[in-house]
C-alpha cells in the first residue's frame, strides 16, 4: 500500500465519457487529513501511519486525546485510522494529505459501513422464497423448517431473522475518474459502501492491474 486517505461519501451522479457513454460515479470528499503518528518496525514491530480526518472542538476532546494531537502539532480530529504502508520516507508527523496523491485512472479499494436495515426477516435478509399465496396458506413469509426432528437442535450458521446491514464492506478495484484538487473531491466509477456522509477509507488497490 502506497496511498491512503480518509473521506466522506457525498452522493452519486453521472458523467459522460469522451466516447459519449454515460458513466455512474460516486463523489467522495477525501481529506485533507493530517499525519498524527508514525510507527516504525524498530520500535513498534511494523510500519504504519496514523492519520486524522475532520477537526473536532477542543471542549469535546478528552485530555489524553489532546496530548496525542498536541504532540503531533495538529488540531484534534474526529476520526483516527491507521494504515500499514510500504514506504513512509516522504511522510512526516503533522504533514497534510490531500487528493493530490491520486491521479485519473488509479485503481483504489474503498472501505465503508453498509447501510443498516434494522431487524429483518429471512426473505429480505437472505433472499428466501416466499410460501404459497393461495388456497388458505398461512405460510407466506415464515422462515420454514430449521432442521430435522432427530437432531433436536438448530445448526450454527442457519439463516434466521436478525439485524441486517451495518457491516464493514470493501469494494475493490474502483477506478478514479476525476480529481478535483481545489475542492478535495474524488470521482470514483461505480458505487461505494454506506450512506451519504458515511466515513470511507481509501487506499490504492491490492489487485490493481496495469
From Swiss-Prot:
Disulfide linkages recorded for this protein, renumbered to the chain, are none
Entry keyword annotation includes Translocase: no
SUPFAM superfamilies from the entry?
A: Translation proteins (SSF50447)
One GO cellular component term of this record is: cytosolic large ribosomal subunit
- Entry keyword set: Ribonucleoprotein, Ribosomal protein, RNA-binding, rRNA-binding
Q: Which GO terms describe its biological process?
A: translation
Q: Give the source's domain of life in one word.
A: Bacteria
Give one Pfam family: Ribosomal_L3
Annotated GO MF terms: rRNA binding; structural constituent of ribosome
- Cite the InterPro entries for this sequence: Ribosomal_uL3, Ribosomal_uL3_bac/org-type, Transl_B-barrel_sf
Similarity section: Belongs to the universal ribosomal protein uL3 family.
Function of this protein?
One of the primary rRNA binding proteins, it binds directly near the 3'-end of the 23S rRNA, where it nucleates assembly of the 50S subunit.
* Cited HAMAP family: Ribosomal_uL3_B
Please give the subunit comment from the record.
Part of the 50S ribosomal subunit. Forms a cluster with proteins L14 and L19.
What protein name applies here?
Large ribosomal subunit protein uL3
Upper classification of the source organism reads: Bacteria, Bacillati, Bacillota, Clostridia, Natranaerobiales
Amino acid at each position: 500500500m502506497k496511498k491512503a486517505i480518509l473521506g466522506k461519501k457525498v452522493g452519486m451522479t453521472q458523467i459522460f465519457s469522451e466516447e459519449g457513454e454515460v458513466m455512474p460515479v460516486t463523489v467522495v470528499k477525501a481529506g485533507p487529513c493530517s499525519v498524527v503518528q508514525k510507527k516504525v518496525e524498530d520500535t513498534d514491530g511494523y510500519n504504519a501511519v496514523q492519520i486524522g480526518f475532520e477537526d473536532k472542538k477542543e471542549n469535546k476532546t478528552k485530555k489524553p486525546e489532546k496530548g496525542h494531537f498536541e504532540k503531533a502539532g495538529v488540531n484534534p480530529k474526529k476520526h483516527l485510522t491507521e494504515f500499514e504502508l510500504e514506504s513512509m520516507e516522504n511522510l512526516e508527523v503533522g504533514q497534510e494529505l490531500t487528493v493530490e496523491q491520486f491521479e485519473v485512472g488509479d485503481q483504489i479499494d474503498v472501505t465503508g459501513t453498509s447501510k443498516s436495515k434494522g431487524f429483518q426477516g429471512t426473505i429480505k435478509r437472505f433472499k428466501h422464497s416466499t410460501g404459497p399465496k393461495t388456497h388458505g396458506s398461512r405460510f407466506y413469509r415464515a422462515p420454514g423448517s430449521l432442521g430435522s426432528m432427530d437432531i433436536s437442535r438448530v445448526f450454527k450458521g442457519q439463516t434466521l431473522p436478525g439485524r441486517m446491514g451495518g457491516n464493514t464492506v470493501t469494494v475493490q478495484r474502483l477506478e478514479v475518474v476525476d480529481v478535483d484538487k481545489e475542492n478535495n473531491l474524488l470521482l470514483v466509477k461505480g458505487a461505494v459502501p454506506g450512506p451519504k456522509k458515511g466515513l470511507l477509507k481509501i487506499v490504492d488497490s491490492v489487485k490493481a492491474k496495469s
